Amino acid sequence: MSRLLTDEEITRQLGDLTGWTREGDEIRATYEAPDFPAAIRLVDEVAVEAEDMDHHPDIDIRWRTVTFALSTHSEGGLTQLDVELAHRIAQAASQLGATAGG
């Protein structure tokens, strides 16, 4: 089990994640992919990473816009797992030409 991050830790770590914001007990980011197939590839890449970590995001797909929301529900808030998965999502998005803030 991961421990909950403090507010200060969350703020500091979000500074390294372009486009990610905190909303209550979640961190969220929206990415705009070049086209719909690229958006689906991004979701597929994130699914592989999420399975590897056994930590799964909430995902909303709208045409070429994909929104990810992360929280460690078993802990009731944000943990290092959320930050690590956010970094993996950001890396996958970058490799597929998706930009944060879509």
Regions found by a protein language model. Name each.
Residues 1-102:
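Charge-rich alpha-helical segments
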